[in-house]
From Swiss-Prot:
Gene Ontology molecular function terms on file: GTP binding; GTPase activity; protein kinase binding
PANTHER family hit by this protein: RHO FAMILY GTPASE
Subunit structure: Interacts with pakB.
CDD domains: BACK_RHOBTB (cd18499), BTB1_POZ_RhoBTB (cd18299), Rho (cd00157)
Biological process, per Gene Ontology: actin filament organization; cortical cytoskeleton organization; establishment or maintenance of cell polarity; mitotic cytokinesis; regulation of actin cytoskeleton organization; regulation of cell shape; response to bacterium; signal transduction
Gene symbol of the encoding locus: racA
Compositional bias of kind Low complexity: 182-197
Cellular component aspect of the GO annotation: cell projection; cytoplasmic vesicle; cytoskeleton; plasma membrane
Name of the molecule in the record: Rho-related protein racA
Entry keyword annotation includes Cell cycle: no
Leader peptide range in chain numbering: none
Superkingdom to which the source organism belongs: Eukaryota
Amino acid sequence: MQAIKLVVVGDGAVGKSCLLIAYTTNAFPGEYVPTVFDNYSANVMIDGKPFNLGLWDTAGQEDYDRLRPLSYPQTDVFLICFSIVSRASFENIRAKWYPEILHHAPNIPIVLVGTKNDLRGHHDLKRPEVSAAEANNLVRELGFSGYVETSALLQTNLRELFSLAIRTATSPKSASAKKKGGFFSSSSSSSSSSSSKSSEKSVPIPPVMPPAGKAPWIDIITSSYDKEMRETLNSESFSDVKFTFFEERPVYAHRVILCSASEFFRRVFGYTLSSDQAEFKLDDLNEGKVKNIRSVTIKPNEKNDDGTKSSGEFVEISIDSSINRRVFNRFIEFLYTGVLNYLDKNDQLQETIALAESVGFKYLASACKNVLGGNEDLNPSIGTFLNDQLGETSKELFFTKKILSDIQFIVEGRSIFAHKALIFSRSNVVNALIGRNFIEREGKVEMSDDVTFDSFMAILEYLYTAHAPIEEGDSVGILVLGNRFDLRRLVSLCELYISKEIERATTIGIFRSELDIIGLLICAQRHNAPQLEKFCLHFISSNYQPMRRRKEFALLDDKTKKHIEDNQWPPIHYLRAVEDYEKEMEKLKSSSKGWFKK
């Protein structure tokens, strides 16, 4: 089986790695991870002949201009890639990539590759595209072997590209051209062998670059929104609704949660969405005209039992005697958590279905039917949907609004209305924050001066919905405040987002990047973000040479510097081997007297 070495070059973030991964795995990678140097392999059949195709990925950033050419020896064919929606990457072919290959590996065939073809014609991107005609003109001008336009996302022309590359590498014309090449052509060993008869010198072999290792995986902590909502329900704290039953103990709940979860209760309490039916009239509720409800009593109430400010009213609802407490409490639990609580199939599930259908809550009926039909494994997806829906509806109805508010936060002199039931149970710190011992003035909590309004609003939105606007906000500020409030899942979300920002910000080059990665590492160390700390340590260590030249490097403590130096990539022994290799090459050039062509 003939072995073919194919090297891919081009600017950072044009899609080189995606091209190789999509070709070798038939799958598109979900996230961009800047390549240091990586290798892939594939066994393919072209024109009935088997080939072992060695695929060499390279880093396009200028930080690796010295090391990248060490991947070029014995190359059979190059792919120079540019993004069709990045004119700068196209212009760099003539300015950088072609001269680099011509210098280090003359006479090796080159195929020009346009990537991200799926973005062609997307006018909303507002980026100047490179036309196929321009690419073909460049092919003719520089003498490339051909041009192929591809999409790794859609698998467009991938097989055609690599088939062309293999045919180009194995064509008689290419073999003839390689024989004319310098040391870095694939036939350099035979060239040097013949030359050694007069020079008694052989071409030094470049040192093998050790792998850099993969970046640490950042795990997102699983949402516990349903468990937190159950804790809120069971605690009965801040409740402003009491459901009563004939000769059974009552069920306490919260209007803001019931309204966020159910159109039926929005109509009962009078806080409807534009898509809801009209609210029930109080007279109809008290005259038995609304199914399942006997009466509704509303009483003014300024204080909760613990002495803290209430939502202003306390509502008592008498439930019809045809509904037993267990079934009704299951309904309320399901509204809060999205989880169906039952012992077995005989645990009054039919009665629960009847109640759910009478109040128009189809999701509870579906969950019960799934259990009865042996499809209970479908219920977790219903719960996830309901948790998200509750959060989104609570945001629409109540977020920062005075309606039913029972607490205010003062941040940077601005007042923010909130609802204790919707933020309770998220963490012990949050619970302490809204408890009676912390509140300095009636129903108000004044945040410290170092808390910014925008970051606090992001935290509050997360407390309501289990989602935070990290992309639109200050992700670092949100992480710092999330750690202060002991919101570990939010911290993990910020860690992942910031890690992706690091990868995106360094596509132009690590030394030139405006992002302060060392500052992010120090922040992660100070604010209990261990996953981000490990990611930054790996990134700085894996890009040691450009990172150590940044002025922020001096801010690192001795322990951190030692860790980075001990784990630096490329390792010191490899860099020393590179220096020795370069010295040997210089000696060889000096002694070759003309037969070595630069």
